[in-house]
Amino acid sequence: MSLKPFTYPFPETRFLHAGPNVYKFKIRYGNSIRGEEIEDKEVIVQELEDSIRAVLANMDSLQPFVTEHFIVFPYKSKWERVSHLKFKHGESILTPYPFVFTLYIEMKWFAEDLPSGKPADDIPLELVLAETEAEEATMRKWKRKLMEEPSSPSRQGPHRAKMETSSEASSNKKPLKESKRSTDEEAQQEYQDTPASNAIAVKEQDAALGHGLQGLVVPPLQHSSPPPPKEPGARGFLGFLSALFPFRYFFKKSGQ
């Protein structure tokens, strides 16, 4: 299988056939790839060809691997609408492989600068992916737990306590209103009873003042008696006559 030159460091898609099959490869380069870092382009072409052969030899169990200059992360995904495609090589019809191979390529020093500080040859590259996947799974589990906690029975205690507290607060408000109403009634009753109590208090205060001021002589008040009502003149004259000569005497004489 002879390959055409690659477009390194630019991404590309290649259709390669081996025997009666056609394979689709996507080559993608990471941010660590710089075209001027490797002057010998033939070395790059050889390493990329060897990477493709390694993927085809282990297509059922893909694992990251290392070349002289690169780290290759191979992935496999479903080839969409592959049934609508037809491939021919000369007169022979080729069968497309139903999966697409994607190669993510980084420079080798990218693994040497990992936080672990260990050399790339001693670190299985799949460990980096496994750690990333584990972190993502942990985050998903944590978010799911946060979403499920409010609806779980164990989390209903504070809500119930909050509801009970609010109900107690509302029940406490009712006696306050009743006590306020009773206080208003008592104040009104006290206001109605105030004149009698004030009169008693005034009498007691006067008695106290009289007891305390015994040395003082208070002149008695002079009450002027009102004149007797004047009767009309006719009534006074008739009364005078009736006093002298009773009418019964005149009526008695006339009857005889």
Curated annotation (Swiss-Prot):
Residues 143-197, 211-235 are annotated as: Disordered. The chain crosses the membrane at residues 233-251. One of its GO terms (biological process) is meiotic telomere clustering. InterPro entries: MAJIN. Residues 1-232 are nuclear. Residues 252-256 are perinuclear space. It is a single-pass membrane protein. Residues 164-173 have a biased composition (Polar residues). Keywords: Chromosome, DNA-binding, Meiosis, Membrane, Nucleus, Telomere, Transmembrane, Transmembrane helix. GO terms for molecular function: DNA binding. It comes from the Eukaryota. Disruption phenotype: Mice develop normally, exhibit no overt phenotype, but are infertile (both males and females). Gonads are characterized by the absence of post-meiotic cells. Impaired localization of Terb1 and Terb2 to the nucleus inner membrane. One of its GO terms (cellular component) is nuclear envelope. Specifically expressed in germline tissues. The keyword DNA-binding applies. Belongs to the MAJIN family. MAJIN was named after the 'genie in Aladdin's lamp' in Japanese. Meiosis-specific telomere-associated protein involved in meiotic telomere attachment to the nucleus inner membrane, a crucial step for homologous pairing and synapsis. Component of the MAJIN-TERB1-TERB2 complex, which promotes telomere cap exchange by mediating attachment of telomeric DNA to the inner nuclear membrane and replacement of the protective cap of telomeric chromosomes: in early meiosis, the MAJIN-TERB1-TERB2 complex associates with telomeric DNA and the shelterin/telosome complex. Component of the MAJIN-TERB1-TERB2 complex, composed of MAJIN, TERB1 and TERB2. This is Membrane-anchored junction protein. It comes from Mus musculus (Mouse). The lineage of its organism: Eukaryota, Metazoa, Chordata, Craniata, Vertebrata.
